[in-house]
Amino acid sequence: MLLLEHESKALLEKYGIKTAKCIFCETEEQAVKAAKEIGFPVVMKVAGREIVHKSDVGGVILNVKSEDEVREVFQRLMSIPKAEGVNIQPQLEKGIEVIVGVAENEQFGSVAMFGLGGVFVEVLKDVSFRLLPLTRRDAEEMVREVKGYKLLEGYRRVKGDVGAVVDLLLKLNEVVERESIVEMDLNPVFVYERGAVVADARIVVGERKRFDYTIPDLRDLFYPKSVAVIGASRTVGKPGFNIVWNLKQNGFMGKIYPVNPNADKILELKCYPSILDIPDEVDMAIIAVPAKIVPEVMAECAQKGIKGAVIVSSGFSEEGEKGAEYERRVLEIAKKHGIRIFGPNTTGVLNTENGFITSFAIQPVIKKGNIGIIAQTGLFLGIMMDIVTSNHPSIGFSKIVGMGNKIDVEDYEVLDFLLKDEQTKVIGIYMEGIKNGRAFYDVASSAEKPIVVFKSGRTEYGQKAAMSHTASICGDDDVFDAVCRQANLVRVYSFDELFDVTKAFSLQPLPKGDRVAIIHYTGSGCVQGSDAAYFAGLKLAEFSKDTVDKISEVTPEWHNVNNPIDIWPMVEYYGAFKAYQTAIEAVMEDEGVDSVIACVWANRLINADFEPDYKSLKKYGKPIYFCVEGARDVVFDHKNALELNGIPVYTNVINAVNVLGKVTKYAKRRIQS
């Protein structure tokens, strides 16, 4: 229900939010009396529950100065269709205009918005968002994030009370929760040097979206002792063959039972006509049969007493209503018998600890490591593993989960499992959509491990017919971006960046600060690195005298030691090994340096492809990244050598700095929380 403005302001005042109080008038005489009581000049506004935006219908009249003018304006406002009365309030001294709002998001629930008013919010979309409830840090960050923050800080002798704005945002927690508010526009709010006043308020109360969820233990789904492959095949290349082959190739530690009524053996494993014919207990089923048969197969799985299933088959809801009906039937059986399901339409699960893999795409033996992946695509247990193993030799995985259509197991459940998994140090997520966003946020915001997220579909806003400014400005991607900031998730925008950043977290320690030393073999690279550091939120470290003295020992007299270090003259005079080793050790020892980026030219002819003393680098407890440039074959060999010894390698200095910037920002927020 839409509250009238005087009702909205009375509600806000109840929670200590200062407003320009208004008097609701239904007659001309009431309006005249109210104006005299308030004192001229006054503001007069049309009031009506079916009038969405007063200004759109000419329903706001400022600077009304006399009794006669009150009478004329009252008649004009009451002639507006759906008018129920007129609100009269004092004409406020103009301050810095801001907008504060709340809207309901389908995935995440109540979202708070802040921005500067006027052109800043309407045209420039200079706004920030956070999920409710807000912490003080959330509110402070919301205010600082907008480009117009400089106006509040102080500009041309005009200054706003930032503390009052933060306090107003924090009061939203209680008022929204207690009063069941689904939409709120406080627009404008005038911010003065001391205090802030809500000049106009629009509030809708109703039933807020609730998010009920539980987080069961998924361990049995990753550690089965026996698995039935239903739809196993003797034909190389068919999904049913590839699944069995992958299980054997990756050394699955449990028992494998191929199910095929027309085969005796597949890859030397005995076949069974159905899962019910297997004499032993079966923990998991991998189902690779046509979608229309899957409900029947699930019924047999339920009869067998399995704990979980991975449905790799496609042809479900992604193909239309008929497929959606198959999903409903499958889920009904699963719920009734307590079976958890990954998929359908997925490559499923990988656990490198026990060799459990459900992919229907032939896979290489996947390296064990500390990266966990949650993906709404089959790519990760498909072609992506070929790309990773050939281009990123350092990357190893603990668990990979392809979510598919997500009819049962959801992202937040897998995320919770990986956060508790001892083999997983960093989590990478690829998502296209999210069902229970609030559950995902709740789990993610409690994480003590870095979470790197690549979400596609950024331009598909999926807006409903928005009835408030806040709802219309609050696009899905804006909200998701706010979720990432609020939960300290590292957001990336491509698969390449996903691997670059997870690799950094996987291989190197977190920086203790934002001061970076950059070493490059060209002056141009030094300039590019400096610019990139600024935009990535990093500071170029100031070297101590001791550091400068050490580096000067391998520096020609005519060359200055600065940060970034242009190392090429040193290489020419003293050789690559001595120049790089001296410079790297010096900056790593410097207490004023938190991280190091070293760039080398890999060229066999001039032997500039420096390879460091790996053991000595680890003792400093600081991250060091390399970028390697040059001839492709030499770069590949040199990159492999570095990464297999725990040093991440990037294509150029800008790439390396951007990754370090994201890692540093994560580390800084983690320390502050």
From Swiss-Prot:
Keywords: ATP-binding, Ligase, Nucleotide-binding. ATP binds at A35, K36, E37, I38, G39, F40, P41, V42, V43, M44, K45, V46. Its EC number is 6.2.1.13. It catalyses: acetate + ATP + CoA = acetyl-CoA + ADP + phosphate. InterPro entries: Acyl-CoA_Synth/Transferase (IPR051538), Acyl-CoA_synthetase_A/B (IPR053698), ATP-grasp (IPR011761), ATP_grasp_subdomain_1 (IPR013815), CoA-bd (IPR003781), NAD(P)-bd_dom_sf (IPR036291), Succ_CoA_lig_flav_dom (IPR032875), Succinyl-CoA_synth-like (IPR016102). Activity requires divalent metal cations. It comes from the Archaea. One of its GO terms (molecular function) is metal ion binding. It is an enzyme of class 6 (ligase). Residues 9-45 form the ATP-grasp domain. PANTHER family: ACETATE--COA LIGASE [ADP-FORMING]. Homodimer. In the N-terminal section; belongs to the acetate CoA ligase beta subunit family. In the C-terminal section; belongs to the acetate CoA ligase alpha subunit family. Catalyzes the reversible conversion of a variety of acids to the corresponding acyl-CoA esters. Shows the highest activity with the aryl acids, indoleacetate and phenylacetate, as compared to acetate. In the reverse direction, phenylacetyl-CoA is the best substrate. Seems to be involved primarily in the degradation of aryl-CoA esters to the corresponding acids. Participates in the degradation of branched-chain amino acids via branched-chain-acyl-CoA esters. This is Acetate--CoA ligase [ADP-forming] II. It comes from Archaeoglobus fulgidus (strain ATCC 49558 / DSM 4304 / JCM 9628 / NBRC 100126 / VC-16).
